[in-house]
Amino acid sequence: MTISKDIPIRVDKEILSGAAVFEGTRVPVSALLDNLEVGVSLDEFIENFPTVTREQAVRVLEHFKSTLNDIKLAA
């Protein structure tokens, strides 16, 4: 299942037991967040996970930011 055409996230029970991954890869989206949390730059993440494009990573982060803004507005 693709989350949205605009968001490059895929969830498929056959891929990493259904973990959210970057579309077209087996890289979990959580890997991006985990790496950023410990101080890895976006450039380093892309270098370490070459199947994920910069555009994909940025679009996912923008989606999360938008979702947080929506939650804030709803509160």
Question: Language-model segments: which ranges?
Answer:
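A short, structured beta-strand/loop element
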Residues: T2-D43
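Long, charge-rich, low-complexity alpha-helical segments
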Residues: P28-A75
